[in-house]
Amino acid sequence: MSEFSQTVPELVAWARKNDFSISLPVDRLSFLLAVATLNGERLEGEMSEGELVDAFRHVSDAFEQTSETISQRANNAINDLVRQRLLNRFTSEITEGNAIYRLTPLGIGITDYYIRQREFSTLRLSMQLSIVASELKRAADAAEEGGDEFHWHRNVFAPLKYSVAEIFDSIDLTQRIMDEQQQLVKDDIAQLLNKDWRAAISSCELLLSETSGTLRELQDTLDAAGDKLQANLLRIQDSTMARDDLHFVDRLVFDLQSKLDRIVSWGQQAIDLWIGYDRHVHKFIRTAIDMDKNRVFAQRLRQSVQTYFDEPWALTYANADRLLDMRDEEMALRDEEVTGELPADLEFEEFNEIREQLAALIEAQLAVYKEKGIPLDLGLVAREFLAQYPRGRHFDVARIVVDQAVQLGVAQADFTGLPAKWQPINDYGAKVQAHVIDKY
């Protein structure tokens, strides 16, 4: 943000001496926003006390407050905003009893944050960057021409300080507002998924795509102009290297370079973080869908029931008792009804026992990676394991390998938010998507 010429103790003493304080409950803030909105509709930029009372009446009605004491409460609210330096009051003998009010810079700043700054516009950003590029080019040309100290102050330092730096601060503020909007979108998505994830999928997709598009649009605009801006800053910096009396210009250029680097780098980092969050939400939705194994049958059954009178149907089933006992926990006890008695010399192993044996074997073989600190490429390891088993067991073995591998450690590349490449793990089209595990 903007640099401060005063030290921290000086600023603290100044604020204490002037008794600065801001207290804006929701009704006071709403009143201030109403004043700013109505004030924006007037060419002269000023409002009478009667107009302020009318604005307060709208706020009072919205908060369902009594109308009997509205004049007194409006007067208190106006005086409160004047006391907090959010409104300026002007009186004269001609307009005695009917003062004129104007918003202060502080009042404009607060209302501008809540009203205008939340409206992201790529056109607005492009215009700001165009103005910055023009100012920087003019300053760079003046710096290469050279001149006395007055020339440097007027044609180089002043445009950089009071035009370029302020626009950089405005862009930085836009990014911080985008950060806040991302948090609000995340809260909205969390509420949607907590209510009904099926109905929320389309809404979540819309919120995710809109935010991703806005971030990408912002970053593309910054990337397109960033190199030209840095080039002009370097031109000014090169022109000051031969002068010992231009430290103030050199320091300002360095600050602007740091701001520009921070703006561009944070824009890219925000996109990477949002990509990671996007993947997290989609993974949650996919997991929820995978848990609903019968979703297709259930959906068709609901549709069939709803359209029964238009398209009647009949359900035919066999072995009614068996159908009713499908979820019977003791069903395994009746296996002999199907298989009959087994010969004494025939050994039978349950799938769970085989799975436990495989898991123990795979766990022992994978432990070597953790003990020696060797990076574990899940694609190569899974392919080696699957080559030892018949095709019918590939799915179960691959699942065990993945389960055991993720228990050993994590991949630091997962924290970048970038997707891993798909790697084939057998000759039948099976693939796995995972980063190399390198932190145990």
Curated annotation (Swiss-Prot):
Subcellular location: Cytoplasm, Nucleoid
UniProtKB keywords: Calcium, Cell cycle, Cell division, Chromosome partition, Cytoplasm, DNA condensation
Single GO term (MF): calcium ion binding
Region of interest (Leucine-zipper), ranges: 208-236
A family per Pfam: MukF_C
One BP term from GO: cell division
GO CC terms of this entry: cytoplasm; nucleoid
Complex and partners: Interacts, and probably forms a ternary complex, with MukE and MukB via its C-terminal region. The complex formation is stimulated by calcium or magnesium. It is required for an interaction between MukE and MukB.
Recorded family membership: Belongs to the MukF family.
The protein's role, per its UniProt record: Involved in chromosome condensation, segregation and cell cycle progression. May participate in facilitating chromosome segregation by condensation DNA from both sides of a centrally located replisome during cell division. Not required for mini-F plasmid partitioning. Probably acts via its interaction with MukB and MukE. Overexpression results in anucleate cells. It has a calcium binding activity.
Record protein name field: Chromosome partition protein MukF
Protein's organism: Klebsiella pneumoniae (strain 342)
Lineage: Bacteria, Pseudomonadati, Pseudomonadota, Gammaproteobacteria, Enterobacterales
